[in-house]
């Protein structure tokens, strides 16, 4: 497996020398922003119960688990940096820290990415010290969805009501007089230290960016609520607020969804040829 990784990484680096996979560094109009490294896993369905490694994963179907890391920019389509094919019942974060470390090492060898700022994005399945530490050790920033544990809920509860800012979202209206969005979706942030249950040297300071939308319960109720309730989506990021403010950080984090298109493309192409 490691030998195949070496072949794939050398091929990618050599290809980048001949084609601007992530854009040309220093070229006119070049994107001065981040290189985004997105990490995600997906289930590839199989049907033979005796197939080696097959099992039931988070999706509830029998299959194999593919773990992917891609790199992209605002102007360049995703490029696969690393991949692992794992047994279907494996937990999503298993081996993710090593994949992140390997992928960031490959990224540094790509000519256009030399000296670029790198942001690793992932969903809550990868919110763990090992994965975050691997990214930070390699010199990248992180933007990772958090799990709603007690510390996160307490941080959200402490956000001042005046701190919420409307954002561009479905059904939002832009007010030209005030230059703001009139929207049901709002964002706010608070300082946050991740992994406080670990020893002090392993705690990671950063920001907790929270997006909230009204809770729209389709079921009728005989007891209306006394106040508006919301659904919250929070993520932890180590980016500088002067580089990515609250609204921009939220937009940037939502861009992680691009890897779902990569998953779909692979399942309709290369991964479709796996024996099922």
What are these regions (language model features)?
Residues 1, 33-43, 78, 118-127, ...:
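Short, conserved catalytic/metal-binding motifs centered on acidic residues
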Residues 1-71:
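Active-site-proximal, Lys/Arg-enriched surface segment
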Residues 39-41, 71-73, 82-85, 122, ...:
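Glycine-rich, histidine-containing beta strand-loop boundary motifs that form or position
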Residues 56-112:
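Electropositive, glycine- and tryptophan-enriched low-complexity nucleic-acid-binding patches
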Residues 143-265:
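An anionic, glycine-rich sequence signature occurring as long contiguous blocks
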Residues 247-251, 271-276:
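Short beta-alpha connecting loops at secondary-structure transitions
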């Amino acid at each position: 497996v490691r030998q195949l990784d070496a072949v794939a990484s050398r091929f990618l680096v050599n290809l980048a020398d001949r084609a601007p996979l992530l854009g040309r560094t220093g070229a006119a109009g070049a994107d001065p922003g981040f290189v985004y490294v997105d990490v995600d896993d997906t289930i590839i369905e199989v049907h033979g119960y005796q197939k080696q490694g097959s099992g039931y994963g988070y999706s509830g179907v029998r299959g194999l688990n593919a773990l992917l890391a891609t790199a992209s920019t605002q102007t360049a389509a995703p490029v696969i940096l690393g991949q692992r094919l794992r047994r279907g019942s494996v937990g999503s974060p298993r081996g993710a820290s090593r994949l992140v470390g390997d992928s960031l090492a490959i990224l540094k060898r790509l000519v256009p990415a030399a000296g670029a700022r790198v942001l690793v994005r992932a969903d809550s399945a990868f919110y763990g010290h090992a994965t975050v530490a691997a990214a930070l050790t390699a010199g990248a920033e992180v933007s990772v969805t958090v799990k709603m544990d007690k510390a996160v809920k307490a941080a959200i509860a402490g956000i001042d009501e005046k701190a919420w800012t409307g954002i561009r979202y479905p059904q939002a209206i832009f007010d030209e007089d005030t230059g703001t969005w009139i929207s049901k979706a709002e964002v706010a942030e608070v300082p946050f230290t991740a992994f406080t249950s670990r020893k002090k040297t392993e705690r990671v300071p950063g920001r907790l960016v929270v997006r909230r939308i009204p809770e729209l319960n389709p079921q009728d109720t005989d007891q209306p609520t006394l106040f508006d309730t919301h659904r919250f989506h929070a993520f932890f990021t180590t980016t500088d607020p002067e580089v990515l403010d609250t609204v921009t950080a939220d937009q940037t984090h939502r861009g992680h969804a691009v890897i779902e298109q990569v998953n779909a493309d692979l399942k309709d192409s290369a991964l479709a040829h796996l024996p099922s």
